[in-house]
From Swiss-Prot:
Expressed by the venom gland. Its main location: secreted. The keyword Transmembrane helix does not apply. It comes from the Eukaryota. This is Venom peptide 5. Keywords: Secreted. One of its GO terms (cellular component) is extracellular region. It comes from Brotheas amazonicus (Scorpion).
Length: 11
């Protein structure tokens, strides 16, 4: 989920 909330978790 790049560019979403998960962007920080996903990388």
């Amino acid at each position: 989920f790049i560019g979403d909330i998960w962007s920080g978790i996903q990388g």
